[in-house]
Amino acid sequence: LSNYQQNFLSKEHPELVEDVQSAVNSDAVFAPILGIYVMGSFGSISQTSASDLDIWICHQDDLSEQEQQRLAEKTKKISQWASTYHVEMHFYLMTQQRFRNERYSDPLTKENSGSAQYMLLLEEFYRSAVRLAGKPLLWLHLWVEDEKQYEAEVARLVAAGELNPNDWVDFGGLGQFSASEYFGASLWQLYKGIDSPYKSVMKILLLETYAQEYPNAQLIARQFKEDLLSGHSTAIHHFDPYIAILERISQYLTAHSEFKRLDFVRSCFYVKATEDFALYHASNWRISYMKMMAQEWGWSKERIEELDQRPNWKIKRVKESHNNLVNFLMMSY
């Protein structure tokens, strides 16, 4: 136990200190939680003070229904506690077999895409996940040329004694993409666009890019892994998932000479990344990066100032922006 944990127990639950310390020191203690990971915009240039936190909790496969319910109740209480600090947290309970079953059993909700996207959700997780606690993710450390051979390669390494699966969390490879998933994921982004239109513009166009490359989509998650394992630190994406999305979209639209859409996407990216710039010092890395990008795009000072004045836009300008967003989303869909 850390000093903080020991002090907390001593003050709040002194009667439990001895039992908890004994359990922690026991080799036979059962650890139901294998790993905790946050995904999405966390740590990226698009994260703002209003961004929510999507947290995956990977637990043992054999937890009873009652144990899963108790774990879910605990995450609910943590979410309620976080809300008192104006932080929105969403927890998702996962097992390592979740994506191998080729079915996403949870129903469609405001924060859960259900079966609308399957491999695409896992790909987003791999390209943006940050490990908070627990075991590292095997997929991020194991390079396989053909994703369809990922499971076979893992089995080979385990059989050869070169890999201990108990040291890792493994949600599986990205070799089971289906064309229908792009349709479901696009619908989901249209729905999410109601609350987060600028982010949805980026994501739905990435789906369009992937769909054009199907069945050999050049996944950002694989690009990140290849760069990491090869020691190649590229100045293009900085291992930032949203900068990488913009780069891929830009390559796709430029190749198709769709410069009007490219310009609109850049505007959406700028707006999303600068939503709370008033909170930051002028030397903040996000401000410096966006200024550099705007200069590379050839934007005028007037255009930048106009976008920076979004909170003061008149109703006519707001309506125009909304209509442009809706038209763009529908065109990409």
Residue locations for each model-derived region?
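Nucleotidyltransferase catalytic cores
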Residues: L1-E15, N101-T109, Y126-Y333
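Helical scaffold of the NTase/Pol beta-like nucleotidyltransferase catalytic core
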Residues: L1-G35, E67-E73
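Catalytic micro-motifs at enzyme active sites that drive phosphoryl/nucleotidyl and oxygen chemistry
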Residues: A23-D27, G35-Q47, I78-A82
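Conserved structured core elements
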Residues: F30, S49-A50, E65, Q69-A72, ...
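Catalytic metal-binding acidic patch
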Residues: I45-Q69, E88-F91
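E2/UBC-UEV (E2-variant) core
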Residues: R70, K74-H90
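Short, conserved secondary-structure transition motifs
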Residues: V87-T109
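Acidic, Ser/Thr-rich peripheral helices and adjacent loops at domain boundaries
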Residues: T109-Y118
